[in-house]
């Protein structure tokens, strides 16, 4: 079995699928399913559709962390609202770096929010859109006009951050980013390194 569509059914769990290692795509949208882990480590699995199910962000992040090559499509309406609210220059940056079309499909939107690397342009002033990129690992904000790192607070997968030549002065939003391994704050306005104490 390669494709399974159980959309709109009364199915509540996926435990009976755990041995189906040839599954490529599963659609469980509009169901009461909350747990994706029975699909964990299926080597051929590439997409899971779970809009309007009980699958939440915490479950999705856990599953993606364990299965980085699987695209999990969920909460698409909220994602589309976020995308439509972005300024056009942010859309250009994200579609260019995620290598998607300028009018991304729902699959491409989910690819965008799961990018691992991002470098922003020098004229960018607001980092808020980055807060949605919770799987990002390498972020380069150098030479930008960004002066506030607050949107980075929840980016727990961040490993490398470059804010060289910016007006950043406060590192407090980085204090809980336990995976951060590299930080470049050359030519910034940072005075205190105290927020880095427990990293």
Specify the residue positions occupied by each region the protein language model found:
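N-terminal capping/linker segments that flank leucine-rich repeat
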Residues: 3, 16, 21, 38-140, ...
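Per-repeat beta-strand-to-loop junction in leucine-rich repeat
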Residues: 5-8, 27-30, 51-52, 75, ...
């Amino acid at each position: 079995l390669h494709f399974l569509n159980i959309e709109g059914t009364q199915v509540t769990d996926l435990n009976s699928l755990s041995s189906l290692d040839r599954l490529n795509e599963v659609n469980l949208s509009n169901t009461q399913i909350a747990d994706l882990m029975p699909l964990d480590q299926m080597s051929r699995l590439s997409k899971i559709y779970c809009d309007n199910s009980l699958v939440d962000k915490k479950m999705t992040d856990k599953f993606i962390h364990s299965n980085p090559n699987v695209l999990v499509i969920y909460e698409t309406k909220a994602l589309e609202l976020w995308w439509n609210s972005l300024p056009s220059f942010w859309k250009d940056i994200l579609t260019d770096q995620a290598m998607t079309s300028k009018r991304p499909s729902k699959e491409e939107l989910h690819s965008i929010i799961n990018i691992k690397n991002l470098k922003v342009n020098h004229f960018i002033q607001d980092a808020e859109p980055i807060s949605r990129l919770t799987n990002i690992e390498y972020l380069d904000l150098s030479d930008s006009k960004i002066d506030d790192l607050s949107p980075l607070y929840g980016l727990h997968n961040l490993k490398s951050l470059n804010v060289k030549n910016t007006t950043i002065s406060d590192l407090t939003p980085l204090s809980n980013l336990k995976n951060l391994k590299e930080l470049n704050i050359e030519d910034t306005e940072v005075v205190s390194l105290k927020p880095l104490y427990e990293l």
